[in-house]
Amino acid sequence: MAQQTAIRNPQSAMEKTNVQMIISGVGGQGVLLVTRIFSEIALKEGYPLIGSEDHGMSQRGGSVLTHIKIGDFDSPLVKKGGADVLLSLEKDEAYRTLHYLRPARNGQRGGLCFINAPDPDYMNPEIKTCLEEQGIGVYIFGADQMAREMGSLQSTNIALVGFAAAHPGFPFSHDRLRAAIERVTAQRFRELSLKIFDRSLLEGRKILKP
């Protein structure tokens, strides 16, 4: 059975921004740590925060999906076509969650999609073209390889966050993300996690464009 929990910060009155995010992957990839990093930034800066965690069969490598809404929202679930950002730690899970991404409308760009995959051309060309025609940015990064090269395959999640942080349209600045990673990661993993974040950020800056 999938389990769903809500995260709220009802005391905050700040309304600086409205952001809707989806993080997807499979059990063991650290989807929930990524959620915690983003939530940490929102809570520390006083943004209203609401979200949902769908753990599914996460203990056995099943799908894991989290919804995060920062700003003035009532429902914790991101609707189809509502996500500003999708981070997928597993390429097949990305296909299952692409429908959440927001198309360009009313003069605003579409959502941003960051996917962990070893081959930058893995995505079906027709699907990628369809997304791009909707103004959705699709960015693929070998986060597994980066984390493995740096000696910590379990830090694939940190590598993908670092890569995404290089995009100027990403809702959190790299310095805020780095500070949040430093706060939420266990001490024994902290130094290497920060190195992986920094290295992936540099790689992202070579690749990503607004």
Positions of predicted regions on the chain:
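Active-site cofactor/cluster-binding pocket
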Residues: 2, 15-210
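Arg/Gly-rich low-complexity intrinsically disordered repeat tracts
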Residues: 5-14
